[in-house]
Amino acid sequence: FRSMKRIILITTCALMTCASAFAQEDEEPKLVIKPTGRILMDAGVMHSTDETLDNQLNDGVAIPDVRMGVSATYGKWKAKVDVGYARQSLSLKDISLDYNFNKENLIRMGYFVHQFGLQSGTSSSFKISMEEPLANQAFFNSRLIGAMYVHAGEKFHATASVFAENDAMKMTTDKLGNEAWGAMTRLVWRPLTERGKIFHIGISGAYESPRYNKNAAISHKSYTLRAPFPTRIANVAAQEATISDAKALWKFSPEMNFAIGNFGFEAQYFYVGIKRDNAMPNYNAWGAYSNVRYLLKGQGYTYTKADAGIATPDPGSLE
């Protein structure tokens, strides 16, 4: 009887060991590689009552952006490389490496768009309009080298980033000088995230040291705020300002997003303050935009918690 007990015990242990081994094999992460890409086409007829602008805003067609890239996932790791081709030249777009601690928390490192407000959460192919609002163009940053922590919880979304200036991707420091740096954060509260019943409010904040300028006299002593007209056919500034004698830039941006059934609305406000040196008056600027959207065909808007915003409409929808 004792011998039988030992045999049963040994057999049970062996089966448990085998089951554990098979479970480990099942849990072994797999490398998944996916190609990515898109083509952006634009056509337009433009007119301005300002004669100078009218001479610059010419009619035409363009293929201003062709993207090709690859993304790879392996367990808790995800990598992305995206290359753009525009106007007969290649440029690096997103180059990032993510580590997912769990379903709600990750850290991203590399060259990418850091979250600051509604427009920063997704790429241009997922936005309401093909081009971003002018206020966002003027006060937001493009892709930056840095690291970003993201918490995408059930009711609360938060990010925190540190970064170097955009020109760090274009020049070595012997030409660029000491790189400008900064930090930013985005905080969102989302009590309603059901289909056709969405509401969130949030606020973003950022600090930046003075940026590079090709004019050596004001390089890393100034900021340039620029917003082009919303077209890729012509690159014409709607607004532009260079603020010299600068010491630091602070900005904040409250946001709101809601949807009821097939109706959606989003709005964002920007405030920028620049502290200046040499007894120059400090510079302040503000801007805002709002977008209204409606599904002519569809079952109501949905919410994406990873990006904190209204998701791209379902396949087969008409917006």
Language-model features: locations:
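A short hydrophobic/aromatic micro-motif that marks alpha-helical segments and, especially, helix-coil
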Residues: 20-21, 168, 274-276
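Surface-exposed beta-loop-beta
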Residues: 180-284
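Flexible, glycine- and charge-enriched loops at secondary-structure boundaries
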Residues: 54, 285
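Bacterial Sec-dependent N-terminal signal peptides
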Residues: 1-26
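Extracytoplasmic loops and strand-loop junctions of Gram-negative outer membrane beta-barrel proteins
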Residues: 50-53, 128-133, 234-241, 275
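Outer membrane beta-barrel
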Residues: 26-48, 56-168, 174-211, 289-315, ...
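Short, solvent-exposed loop/turn segments at secondary-structure boundaries
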Residues: 171-175, 278-281
